[in-house]
UniProtKB/Swiss-Prot annotation:
Reactions catalysed: (6R)-5,10-methylene-5,6,7,8-tetrahydrofolate + NADP(+) = (6R)-5,10-methenyltetrahydrofolate + NADPH; (6R)-5,10-methenyltetrahydrofolate + H2O = (6R)-10-formyltetrahydrofolate + H(+)
Positions that bind NADP(+): G161, R162, S163, I231
Gene Ontology CC terms, in alphabetical order: cytosol
Coiled coil: none
Name the UniProt record assigns to this protein: Bifunctional protein FolD
GO molecular function: methenyltetrahydrofolate cyclohydrolase activity; methylenetetrahydrofolate dehydrogenase (NADP+) activity
Oligomeric and partner information: Homodimer.
Family membership noted in the UniProt record: Belongs to the tetrahydrofolate dehydrogenase/cyclohydrolase family.
Length: 292
């Protein structure tokens, strides 16, 4: 079965829109800081602000020059921290090489950290306090599995990739002792020598490594569940733009062996944006003392 992440994300966005319409206060507001004119970043930010508008969340796009210093960027973040009209702050990655993204994230108010990357929120997640802000992509995957009715308890989950954005927090969520967790988790990375062996053992594979069609049909068992987080451009002369977007899984050949699989595009990507909207609503509801 192909999991339609776009449909599930639309359901979540409709729920968020209805909750916002019930509120008598000001609309929630998300501030997005983007440094430089990286084309992909501009596309991602525009998608996020469009999604905000669709559900009734106000958004502010703060465009800053590529040459901005780390200290200047931190000052911009701190201005937003103390602005009572701002509920969520997101610093669009990647940042220029002269800026330490971790240090910038440390300066975001944890109560406005809707990306879920502040050390306080990461720490709360690690000790099982899941009522705060969870990183949007792992949160989206968790929600996708739950809404599809997939039980991960007792399953062997293999996470391929150990980034701070996807791999590490995903492992933390799946191993937690709560409904939707309790998996036996293995994390693979570039130095893992027996990847095929691990894949064949896994009941659930979540791959986020940025390598097109890394996972092939001979690497997975029948009935596996696969969540493909990869987004890769590959040359395709049959396409008008000369390329196609693929994931980290050889979808055409792997899908027939899967009990469930997410497509690329239309799988995890829409869920990431939906959970950003959810986190913004959560921050807003806390600041306004609302029980939404």
């Amino acid at each position: 079965m192909i999991i339609d992440g776009k449909r599930i994300a639309e359901e979540i966005q409709l729920e968020i829109k209805e909750l916002i319409q019930q509120s008598l206060c000001r609309p929630p507001c998300l501030a997005v800081l983007i440094v430089g004119s990286h084309p992909a970043s501009q596309i991602y930010v525009n998608r996020k602000t469009a999604a905000c508008k669709a559900v009734g969340i106000a958004s502010i796009k703060c465009e800053l020059p590529f040459t901005i210093s780390e200290e200047e960027l931190i000052r911009e973040v701190e201005k937003l921290n103390v602005d009572p009209q701002i509920d969520g702050i997101l610093v669009q990655l990647p940042l220029p090489p002269h800026i330490n993204s971790n240090r910038v994230n440390y300066h975001i108010d944890p109560q406005k950290d809707v990306d879920g990357f502040h050390p306080l929120n990461v720490g709360k997640m690690l000790i099982g306090e899941l009522d705060g802000f969870l990183p949007c992509t792992p949160f989206g995957i968790k929600t996708l599995l739950e809404r599809t009715g997939i039980e991960v308890c007792g399953k062997h989950a293999l996470i391929i990739g150990r980034s701070n954005i996807v791999g590490k927090p995903m492992a933390a969520l799946l191993m937690q002792s709560y409904p939707g967790g309790n998996a036996t988790v293995t994390v693979a990375h570039r130095y893992t020598k027996n990847l095929k062996e691990l894949c064949l053992q896994a009941d659930l594979i979540i791959v986020a490594i940025g390598q097109p069609k890394l996972i092939t049909a001979d690497m997975v068992k029948e009935g596996v569940i696969i969540v493909d987080v990869g987004i890769n451009k590959i040359h395709d002369s049959s396409k008008k733009n000369g390329y196609q977007i693929v994931g980290d899984v050889d979808f055409v050949n792997v899908a027939p062996k899967c009990a469930f699989i997410t497509p690329v595009p239309g799988g995890v990507g829409p869920m990431t944006i939906a959970m950003l909207l959810y986190n913004t609503l959560l921050s807003y509801s806390k600041s306004q003392n609302l029980n939404l």
